[in-house]
């Protein structure tokens, strides 16, 4: 559509940097793959080159979960606050924990992420937490939300 609008023969690269890019972190999905654009975005984040335009919508859908992530942090922090934990301490603990978990996931991103789930102690607290959420269909609801976001694109 853009090519028709500008009426010039140009190469258009679609890129959507996410807000954490201001920290020099986070993904930038680009379509179509382009060496110069990749080099540019590699300096400020993690460039993901998409080879098929139809597949790009999958990445854009995932970006629609940022507020859900923040809401999860908010719920966890508020739970601690209701347990008489100081608000600042609650938020620092939760955000520091999830930042560290994200770093571990990134370090393991070449392996199946399911491995991190399976590393939890069977019958332990994390095992209980993930299984309670599975029984409540939390993860299925997350996929359902992703499918709705995808349809909007």
Roles of regions detected by a PLM:
Residues 35-54, 126-133, 138-140:
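A charged, well-structured terminal subsegment
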Residues 71-77:
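Oxidoreductase and adenylate-handling cofactor-binding alpha/beta cores
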Residues 20-22, 43-67, 86-88, 113:
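Conserved Rossmann-fold dehydrogenase catalytic segment
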């Amino acid at each position: 559509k853009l090519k028709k609008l500008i009426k010039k023969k140009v190469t258009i690269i679609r890129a959507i940097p996410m807000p954490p890019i201001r920290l020099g972190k986070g993904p930038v999905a680009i379509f179509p793959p382009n060496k110069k654009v990749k080099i540019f975005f590699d300096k400020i984040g993690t460039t993901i080159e998409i080879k098929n335009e139809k597949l790009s919508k999958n990445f854009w859908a995932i970006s629609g979960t940022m507020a859900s992530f923040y809401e999860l942090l908010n719920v966890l922090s508020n739970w601690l606050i209701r347990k008489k934990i100081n608000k600042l301490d609650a938020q620092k603990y939760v955000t520091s924990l999830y930042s560290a978990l994200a770093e571990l996931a990134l370090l393991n991103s070449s392996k199946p992420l399911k491995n991190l789930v399976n590393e939890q102690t069977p019958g332990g607290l994390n095992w209980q937490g993930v299984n309670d959420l599975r029984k409540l269909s939390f993860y299925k609801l997350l996929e359902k939300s992703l499918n709705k976001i995808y349809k909007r694109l």
